């Protein structure tokens, strides 16, 4: 897979074309301040155009796709987003309004008669998100932290739970989770389905504000442990191994260039293609033979 880039005289990316396992191309235009104002994405013979507009402070005020999907934004004097209006490809608008406390922390997000309330501890870390909804009633996400303000536990509105451990240097050692990770956030449930965006995953009645005792007995805890490359300026996760409470285990190894470029399992390789904004535009998975994980791991100092 090969990607060719083209730049203007000041280093702005103008064109990007990937060939081989992926056939995808991008072109970009910019305003005088260097902000992207236009993107053209061509993939599989289909072209999607996106345009971006900004205010005098460089804050994004609108995003419009040729599909008809649109987002508009408004801000207060402190630069906090106070309104986000999403217009689906069917022309239906959804307006989300946000408010903040004196510390510029988000305190509420409102969609009509539904809202999410956010609370924080004395260190400024979010401890709860509570959705009050006509469709779902009251749903709560809760967060807990250690003395260093590192997230140690997340308990979701549907019983999904995560626990985290760290080493003495603050690097995450492991993540344990139970429940179905294929779920929507409270913010997604607040806005609801919008034409042009992926459909939300609605919780069942039995999932609403469930706790661990309510979880189906067949669900297992799974723990992921991380291996780091310490030779880089910013430590990179070079592999992660996930083991279920039943003993099943799988490892994924990662390769990097300027970004993460590939992931390897025992029988597959996933290659990543990025757009000009640094977001993953494509993930291409193909089967491989042999010790894919072992061959992907670099010979470096690592920490578990």
Regions found by a protein language model. Give the residues of each.
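Extracellular, surface-exposed repeat architectures
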Residues: 104-110
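Alpha-helical "lid/cap" subdomains adjacent to substrate-binding clefts that gate access
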Residues: 233-239
